[in-house]
């Protein structure tokens, strides 16, 4: 007899990566719940997202991180809690942790991670402080004895591949004439399509192999340097791009001189594409790799992703 699939609550489900996780959960056959603030329903864009959730059979629960009672009530209905709250709310996840402790029924908590392994990064400010909040949440989860999985996903394909990592507002497709490469362009980065990140993450929620572990989503075809990504694109369009290298010293200077949120983005880009912070070895005592655990998931390679734009 097949094991019954867990009931999943997504907090922050109308956000960027949250939408993909809600959809993946519902499509994988989990009873899926999304905690939504009343104010979200009046937002025309997010209101449409909520309706799309309902069309998938998702149960919409009304609540708020600042309403402890609503959190506990929502959490008591599920087995797994996935948080996808944004960067400004990372530390507010202590409220989710408190509600999980009071509810007493949660088998797994996945806090808002979905990026680098924050315990193993050499990021400069302001990314360093942003990651520090996630580290604090990890330590709180562990201290409270809450069962967890940390989803370390590398970069979102939708953030980086349509622009070839170019920081140009308004750019919606890869450049066909010139490109700026960060540093020497040789540091390898992990980049995954959002739907694949969600599929792997949902697979992990009921898997004992991922309990109290870090789930690294690092399929072999999706770990490439910026130089390699540019070369793939050049082959697809049949021409060479004019390349300009931005030295690390200049990037660090730009980070210091840029306003929020540009400095945050640039410091993350420095961590990923100059330091190579997403391309780390996996320590088996606390980490597992998603594509090895779930070879049945047909992921989109970076090469295939770029073909959408060629």
UniProtKB/Swiss-Prot annotation:
Q: What is its EC number?
A: 1.3.1.-
What's the top EC group for this one?
Answer: oxidoreductase
Induction (free text): Induced by cadmium.
Q: Which GO terms describe its cellular component?
A: cytosol; mitochondrion; plasma membrane
Q: Which Gene3D superfamilies match?
A: NAD(P)-binding Rossmann-like Domain (3.40.50.720), UDP-galactose 4-epimerase, domain 1 (3.90.25.10)
Task: Assign the protein's first listed, main location to one coarse class.
Answer: cytoplasm
Active site annotation, chain numbering: 134
Q: What keyword terms does UniProt attach to this protein?
A: Cytoplasm, NADP, Oxidoreductase
Top-level taxon: Eukaryota
- Record carries keyword Ubl conjugation: no
Q: Tell me its family.
A: Belongs to the NmrA-type oxidoreductase family. Isoflavone reductase subfamily.
Q: What is this protein called?
A: Isoflavone reductase homolog P3
Write the lineage as a comma-separated list: Eukaryota, Viridiplantae, Streptophyta, Embryophyta, Tracheophyta
